[in-house]
């Protein structure tokens, strides 16, 4: 296919003068961006029909013929883009010439370089909605002070009154002259002479908007936006709404069948969404983002001052907008609910590329290999049978195979997206062998759990959500959210019980000190009840781990079979916690001891001492992965359904104790040394013993500090204690001072600088979107992105991996 160069730079036809791109986009809106000529785009006839319905105030009737051969989205080559403005109303619109790609062109590995010039967005401008006094014949136009100082040339305040003449050009290159004066009580900026002429010529009324722009050459431009008003009288020469719907559908269907060119007109102020978008934007949204019901998201909206604002919402459903005419369409396939009370002004349905889900996938192309948070089923691949059909993205989006969910396969050719997907999918993470072993171990462990023991029941509650997740599809995410809440509640109850029991045994400190001075054999006998209590508390987890280690041919301590089958080994509570029997958990063991010999003699924790030291800090590669069982499997951060970060095993506030000589060191937990059971049990046993044995005081100042690394291209990474701040504003100010970029981080939309952070799950998120407490608890390190870094991330994706450190130091 030969590319047309007549549209490069948005040139007009037949000598028509090219419109100013900045002014056109200012009138169109801050969220509108035309694709470049020569690029590949996706055309949605369903969205085009929506525009026709909006302009004619009439929805599509049922008797309009359907075109089964017309797919819900067409991959096209954009040959020409021309910007226009209506002579009578100054309404801006764009004319696009599209040509559908052939099946062979859709399968091309490399996308042709875009030859067009990117759309130029305005930088210095202001927009004001006119009031009744602004449109009166005897008044003037009141300009906000900050807007006048930002856009208009500076006034000479030595004059009385300060005044000057302004010359501005509109979309049709017509000059308008105004007298700019600073007067009144209180004094304000006004446009007087020439303003009433402009209002009359443009037929402006209260509610319309006026836009002033100053370009790089300090030239002024002037544009208008008419408020939406209902059409009462339609000229007879105008085509009916039904005729327009039939015409656009017939033209698109013919072009799709013959691969011929067709023309569409895009009216940005009439259309609620763009129905011609860049192919790269579509691929990123549909194939590189996975959403589910209940997920949080953000979306940009235009304000009255022609700026943008983010609104937050929740995904409430995923389905076709019109399953009869447009099955398997991505157009407005996401049902949403908005947070704020003004949600009535926003659409209840949006398209996937319009939102930014607050999930594991970043808003920019991923800089790291794609890691799946949970094991995938064999039927959830986004590329079934190695093909890249457009419908496969929607099948993946809905959490299962198309046939299982009642979705019909699409009947139009594939679009050749497979080469791009190869760069993003890590197929090594999509095997099912590990998933089957994981599910089998969970099922075996759950069958060996007694039903009458409260402590074990709490562990069952922690295991069941993850076990059930492997048997359910993504459509049951709402149930999983409820189960996660129950899991967190069970964890809090267990931690509260452990803390209470520890505090009840603090009076036994003197006895513990005497025990530490006795021979090792006597210490082992006295500590046996405590050790047995902790061992039984985690016996279920050790049993699961033993099975897993045997399958993976890794060494593990030998446990007797009776550990899991002997019904006599049960917990029994004693009468009083103050009995002084030395049993930490106040349990009596009625059966035989199941404590292996090596657990009483080996361990990685420091030896006993009488002095407190800094808080316990487990060695870890990076946060959230401290108890990884499979070093080669990055999607296994939990211990058989129990999240190590939840604080179930060891709360982060438990202190550790070091000997006064400073020779006690902690070695990493390893499965190849004495086994994970030794490390976990020794950590619990020694740390609890030291808590009861020590006589010092905890240094509380070390507990409250939360140091993170901050990186910036061209600068050395620095550490920052974010616990000193209480808001994002304070953090931005401190980062600006730290790297000598004051004022650039407070307004990212204007400066182009962005602050992003990587959380404990190694995901890149935009700083400022989450509540402050959630950010403090989940941040791993912070990255300051210059405008060049942001552009590099957007253009090169994974090729920009140098922007982020691969192994940053975590404090």
UniProtKB/Swiss-Prot annotation:
Residues 126-228 bind DNA. SUPFAM superfamilies: CAD & PB1 domains, DNA-binding pseudobarrel domain. CDD domains: B3_DNA (cd10017). Disruption phenotype: Seedless (parthenocarpic) fruit. It is found in: Nucleus. The keyword Nucleus applies. Induction: Repressed by miR167. One of its GO terms (molecular function) is transcription cis-regulatory region binding. GO terms for biological process: auxin-activated signaling pathway; flower development; fruit development; response to auxin. Expressed in the whole plant. Keywords: Activator, Auxin signaling pathway, DNA-binding, Nucleus, Transcription, Transcription regulation. Residues 705-789 form the PB1 domain. The keyword Coiled coil does not apply. GO terms for cellular component: nucleus. Residues 469-482, 544-555 have a biased composition (Polar residues). Its main location: nucleus. Disulfide bonds: none annotated. Residues 467-496, 544-565 are annotated as: Disordered. Homodimers and heterodimers. Interactions between auxin response factors (ARFs) and Aux/IAA proteins occur through their C-terminal dimerization domains III and IV. Auxin response factors (ARFs) are transcriptional factors that bind specifically to the DNA sequence 5'-TGTCTC-3' found in the auxin-responsive promoter elements (AuxREs). Seems to act as transcriptional activator. Formation of heterodimers with Aux/IAA proteins may alter their ability to modulate early auxin response genes expression. Regulates both stamen and gynoecium maturation. Promotes jasmonic acid production. Partially redundant with ARF6. Involved in fruit initiation. Belongs to the ARF family. This is Auxin response factor 8. It comes from Arabidopsis thaliana. The lineage of its organism: Eukaryota, Viridiplantae, Streptophyta, Embryophyta, Tracheophyta.
């Amino acid at each position: 296919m030969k590319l047309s160069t007549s549209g490069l730079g948005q040139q007009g036809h037949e000598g028509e003068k090219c419109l100013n791109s900045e002014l056109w986009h200012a009138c169109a809106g801050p969220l509108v961006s035309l694709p470049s000529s020569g690029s590949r785009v996706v055309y949605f006839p369903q969205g085009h029909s929506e525009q026709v319905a909006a302009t004619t105030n009439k929805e599509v009737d049922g008797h309009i013929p359907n075109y089964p051969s017309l797919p819900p989205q067409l991959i096209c080559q954009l040959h020409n883009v021309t910007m226009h403005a209506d002579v009578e109303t100054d309404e801006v619109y764009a004319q696009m010439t599209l040509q559908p790609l052939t099946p062979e062109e859709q399968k091309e590995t490399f996308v042709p370089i875009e030859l067009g010039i990117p759309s130029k967005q305005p930088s210095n401008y202001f927009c004001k909605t006119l009031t009744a006094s602004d449109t009166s014949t005897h008044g003037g136009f009141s300009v906000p002070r900050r807007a006048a100082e930002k856009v208009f040339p500076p006034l000479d305040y030595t004059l009385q009154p300060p005044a000057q003449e302004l010359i501005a050009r509109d979309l049709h290159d017509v000059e308008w002259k105004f007298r700019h004066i600073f007067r009144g009580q209180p004094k304000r900026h006004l446009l007087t002479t020439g303003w009433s002429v402009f209002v009359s010529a443009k037929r402006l009324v209260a509610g319309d908007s006026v836009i002033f722009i100053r370009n790089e050459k300090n030239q002024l431009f002037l544009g208008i936006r008419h408020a939406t008003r209902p059409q009462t009288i339609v000229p007879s020469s105008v085509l009916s709404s039904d005729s327009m719907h039939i015409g656009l559908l017939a033209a698109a269907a013919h072009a799709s069948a013959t691969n011929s060119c067709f023309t569409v007109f895009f009216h940005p102020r009439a259309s609620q969404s763009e129905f011609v978008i860049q192919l790269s934007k579509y691929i990123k949204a549909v194939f590189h983002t996975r959403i589910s019901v209940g997920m949080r998201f953000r979306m940009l909206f235009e304000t009255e001052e022609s700026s943008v604002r983010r609104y937050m919402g929740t995904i409430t459903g995923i389905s076709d907008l019109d399953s009869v005419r447009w099955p398997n369409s991505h157009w407005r396939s996401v049902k949403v609910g908005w947070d704020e009370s003004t949600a009535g002004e926003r659409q209840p349905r949006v398209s996937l590329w319009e939102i930014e889900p607050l999930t594991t996938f970043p808003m920019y192309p991923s800089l790291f290999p794609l890691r799946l948070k949970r094991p995938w089923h064999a039927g959830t691949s986004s590329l079934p049978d190695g093909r890249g059909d457009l419908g496969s993205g929607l099948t993946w989006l809905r959490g299962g195979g198309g046939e299982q969910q009642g979705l019909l396969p699409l009947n139009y050719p594939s679009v050749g997206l497979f080469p791009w997907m190869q760069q993003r999918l890590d197929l090594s993470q999509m095997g099912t062998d590990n998933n089957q072993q994981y599910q089998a171990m969970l099922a075996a462990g759950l069958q060996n759990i007694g039903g009458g023991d409260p402590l074990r029941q709490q562990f069952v509650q922690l295991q069941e959500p993850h076990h059930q997740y492997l048997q359910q599809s993504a459509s049951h995410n709402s149930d999983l959210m409820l189960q996660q809440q129950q899991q967190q509640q069970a964890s809090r109850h267990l931690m509260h019980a452990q803390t209470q029991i520890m505090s009840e045994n603090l009076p036994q400190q003197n006895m513990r000190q005497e025990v530490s001075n006795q021979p090792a054999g006597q210490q082992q006998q006295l500590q046996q009840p405590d050790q047995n209590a902790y061992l039984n508390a985690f016996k279920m987890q050790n049993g699961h781990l033993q099975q897993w280690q045997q399958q993976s041919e890794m060494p593990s301590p030998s446990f007797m079979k009776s550990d899991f089958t002997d019904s006599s080994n049960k917990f029994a509570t004693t009468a009083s916690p103050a009995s002084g029997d030395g049993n930490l958990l106040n349990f009596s063991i009625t059966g035989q001891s199941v404590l292996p010999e090596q657990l009483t003699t080996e361990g990685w924790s420091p030896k006993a001492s009488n002095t407190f030291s800094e808080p316990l800090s487990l060695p870890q590669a990076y946060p959230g992965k401290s108890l990884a069982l499979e070093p080669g499997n990055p999607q296994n951060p939990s211990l058989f359904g129990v999240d190590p970060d939840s604080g179930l095993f060891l709360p982060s506030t438990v202190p550790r104790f070091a000997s006064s000589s400073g020779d006690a060191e902690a070695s990493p937990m390893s499965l190849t040394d004495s086994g994970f059971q030794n490390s976990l049990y020794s950590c619990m046993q020694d740390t609890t013993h030291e808590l009861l044995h020590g006589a010092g005081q905890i240094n509380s100042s070390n507990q409250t500090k939360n140091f993170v690394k901050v990186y910036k291209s061209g600068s050395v990474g620095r550490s920052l204690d974010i616990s000193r701040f209480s808001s994002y504003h304070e953090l931005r100010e401190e980062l600006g001072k730290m790297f000598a970029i004051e004022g650039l981080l407070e307004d990212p939309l204007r400066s182009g600088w962005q602050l992003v952070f990587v959380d404990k799950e190694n995901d890149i998120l935009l700083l400022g979107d989450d509540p402050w407490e959630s950010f403090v608890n989940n941040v791993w390190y912070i990255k300051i992105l210059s405008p060049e870094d942001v552009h590099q991330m957007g253009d090169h994706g994974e090729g920009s991996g140098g922007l982020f450190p691969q192994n940053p130091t975590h404090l």
